[in-house]
Design a protein with these regions (language model features):
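N-terminal Rossmann-like NAD(P) cofactor-binding module of classical short-chain dehydrogenase/reductase
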Residues: 50, 54-60
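Substrate/ligand-engaging "lid" and interaction regions
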Residues: 39, 137-140, 144-169
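Short acidic low-complexity segments
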Residues: 39-52
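Rossmann-fold NAD(P)-binding glycine/threonine-rich loop
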Residues: 62-135
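Conserved short alpha-helix immediately C-terminal to the canonical SAM/SAH-binding motif I
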Residues: 19, 127, 151
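Short, surface-exposed basic-aromatic patches at helix termini and helix-loop junctions that form
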Residues: 2-3, 28-33, 110, 129-141, ...
Length: 169
């Protein structure tokens, strides 16, 4: 993996120190044993996390798991779709996510104005549109969603063929 995907530095950032600490400690052990030349750190400080970075991979859950439960259960209690990326819950989650993502991108651009940002936060379409509107000239923000691949794979199963045989374009 080192030859195929060489890294010099990896920093894990989280706003919740208690949630982050076990992952960070595991990373300390794993990388010191398997990738000792990698500079590894974990932090709750945005400057430490973002300063001088070339690539930033982001995934956040605005409101945490408690709000995910609310986003799913409140619509279900009213006979509506209870899902985190669509329906009433998806819209609530999206609105929360947009605020936090915009703030995070502003922080990143303060410390790493030229970093590539790969965003994998849900709901992908809502967040991507908010970021496009807030940062219309920033061509280094890439929003990623795995749903198109899932649609192709599900369709291939329905058609009884390999997903590689389908051309979605």
């Amino acid at each position: 993996l080192k030859e195929e995907f060489p890294l010099n530095k990896l920093v894990l950032f989280d706003i919740n120190k208690e949630r982050q600490e076990p992952i960070g400690k595991y990373g300390d052990i794993m990388f010191s044993e398997r990738y000792p030349e990698l500079e590894f750190a974990y932090t709750t400080d945005p400057k430490t996390a973002y300063e001088g970075m070339d690539f930033i991979f982001m995934q956040m859950r605005a409101g945490g798991l408690q709000m995910r439960r609310e986003d799913e259960h409140i619509p279900l209690s009213m006979g509506l779709i209870g899902q985190e990326t669509c329906g009433a819950g998806g819209m609530a989650y999206g609105l929360r996510s947009c605020v936090d993502m915009i703030e995070a991108i502003h922080q990143i651009r303060t410390y790493s104005p030229n970093a590539w940002i790969l965003n994998y936060s849900n709901p992908a379409a809502i967040v991507a549109e908010a970021l496009r509107r807030e940062f219309p000239d920033d061509k280094r923000i890439l929003n990623i969603c795995d749903q198109p691949e899932n649609v192709v794979r599900s369709t291939s199963r329905l058609l009884g063929c390999s997903w590689e045989d389908l051309d979605p374009v």
